[in-house]
Curated annotation (Swiss-Prot):
It catalyses: an N-acyl-L-alpha-aminoacyl-tRNA + H2O = an N-acyl-L-amino acid + a tRNA + H(+). This is Peptidyl-tRNA hydrolase. Its main location: cytoplasm. Disulfide bonds: none annotated. Keywords: Cytoplasm, Hydrolase, RNA-binding, tRNA-binding. Monomer. GO terms for molecular function: peptidyl-tRNA hydrolase activity; tRNA binding. The record marks D93 as: Stabilizes the basic form of H active site to accept a proton. Belongs to the PTH family. HAMAP family: Pept_tRNA_hydro_bact. It is found in: Cytoplasm. The gene is pth. TRNA binds at Y15, F66, N68, N114. Hydrolyzes ribosome-free peptidyl-tRNAs (with 1 or more amino acids incorporated), which drop off the ribosome during protein synthesis, or as a result of ribosome stalling. Catalyzes the release of premature peptidyl moieties from peptidyl-tRNA molecules trapped in stalled 50S ribosomal subunits, and thus maintains levels of free tRNAs and 50S ribosomes.
Amino acid sequence: MIKLFVGLGNPGPEYEFTRHNAGFWWLDAVARELKASLAMDKTYHGLVTRVTVNGQAVWLLKPQTFMNLSGKSVAALARFFKIEPQEILVAHDELDIVPGEAKLKLGGSHAGHNGLRDIHAQLGTDDYWRLRLGVGHPGVKSEVINWVLKKPSLDHRLAMDQCIARAITALPHLLAGDMDKATLLIHTSKPPRPKPPRPENTLPAVP
């Protein structure tokens, strides 16, 4: 089962609504679902809360170290409470997935994501779960930093919010350790296609 849920982002109001904070948005949704409130804990360099699910302690964490030092926070909590890498799920923004979609993944490269890069380094492994929340790609590599540090368009933000809400439905499976069911649910829960416009009532053409 997942014992540590981590949402990645940058602290501070100037970053709150930027694409890079998608992981924070998801973790906030998890906290609401579990009726939990996070509080700053300097020992773990982040906003933290502990809940009990079916007799098991579960931790929620939002590192407050800035993105490129996220691993410092994750490793501090995981090591103290003896949480194994495969019991950790990290939610983060993903350039290679369109807004409105998410993917669950175990292990693999950090793909240039500085938060994941530092978690890899601090844990000494890439063998942890990631929830990849699509934010889309600007189309030009040189614009990536500006892209993730800006607010998404209203349409993209709505799609991302809906995606986060759908991903929350997999939470019981994540907590139970049924990663296959969680993966299936997250990967198949795509936004519904918009309905085609209703045809207008028109009079028949006059011959």
